[in-house]
Amino acid sequence: KYQVLPFFWIPEENIDQRVRRDHVPYDVWERQGFLYTTEGNVVHYGFIETFIEELGMKYNIKEIAFDRWGAVQMTQNLEGLGFTVVPFGQGFKDMSPPTKELMKLTLEERIAHGGHPVLRWMMDNIFVKTDPAGNIKPDKEKSTEKIDGAVALIMALDRAIRGGNSNGGSIYDLRGLLSI
């Protein structure tokens, strides 16, 4: 069984505006500890990098997968902190195998996330896009829907599988936490 420990962030200055605009209970999730806020009206990546650094001290993080089209500065900063960062494509080639595996593991009840409401909401927002060859990848049908956490889970699952965690035990017992 794979144990998932998700973390999510939102800018604190516009959380109320986002609640009204998106009709999503970000404020409730923040009060319940399922969503973290960062100072200002945009996500403060320095805060997240520090958070990841602290996780690295607590867990044995082997590597961090990232979308190579949007995380150049954070990737460089995390490398500077000593983390191994691995580029991960968002197309069918890279996303299809772990997406299919996540679907299989979910049906087998081998993914545990403790009922995390933010991750559950993002998973519910996924629309599975299929190419002519039968490859699949996550997509979203509406621009207001968020699927970032679901995509991060798929990327982390791929890295966990490639890391050789096939014994059915907790991934944390073998190699620590993957953070994306």
Feature-to-residue mapping (PLM):
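RNase H-like, metal-dependent nuclease domains and their acidic two-metal-ion catalytic environment used
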Residues: 1-90, 96, 100, 113-180
